[in-house]
Design a protein with these regions (language model features):
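Sec-dependent N-terminal signal peptides
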Residues: 4-15
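Structural beta-strand segments of beta-rich domains
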Residues: 32-36
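Internal, hydrophobic beta-strand segments that form the core of beta-sheet-rich folds
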Residues: 103-132
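Short Trp-Ser/Thr-centered turn/loop motifs at beta-strand boundaries
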Residues: 133-147
Length: 147
């Protein structure tokens, strides 16, 4: 009986549908602000849809959302990309430059923008899945520093 249960548990673990579908590899662990690059590899036999977000480390071990999507400007619309089976893509992007607003009505936006543009420790958060409505698998990259 124990052998049967053990075999069933191993089989379920082997056929786990929520296993990691992609692998993220950084070109470095330290980047200047104008040349952040990384590669994403599809480790599955099916097309994988994915969206990349950037998180910044705050005080302690907590990470907060820095951008909704690294492929468009900060706080912009999300872009979902497709990666073919056993394929990979290399991406390079630049963070938004610091913006200074001197008009009173833009004071709140300026304060928020300047706060977000501080250098620090970051990581990529990648949502992926086999279709657009079920991108529920989350994969994190190694942490890296932006100088």
């Amino acid at each position: 009986m124990r052998r049967i249960i053990f075999t069933m548990v191993l089989t379920l673990c082997f056929f786990d549908a929520s296993s990691q579908k992609i692998d993220i590899q950084l070109s470095s662990h330290t980047f200047p602000n104008d040349s952040i690059s990384f590669s994403i590899y599809n480790t599955d036999s099916l097309d994988v849809l994915f969206n990349v977000q950037l998180e910044k480390k705050e005080k302690g071990e907590k990470y907060v959302l820095y951008t909704e999507d690294v492929f468009s400007h900060a706080y912009g619309k999300s872009i979902v990309l497709c990666l073919k089976p056993s394929g990979h893509s290399t991406f390079k992007f630049k963070l938004r430059s610091q913006v200074l607003f001197y008009m009173r009505k833009h004071k709140v936006q300026s304060k928020m923008t300047n706060n977000l543009n501080k250098k620090g420790e970051f990581r990529f958060k990648v949502y992926c899945g086999f279709n657009y409505n079920e991108m529920n698998t989350v994969v994190y990259s190694d942490r890296f520093i932006i100088l």
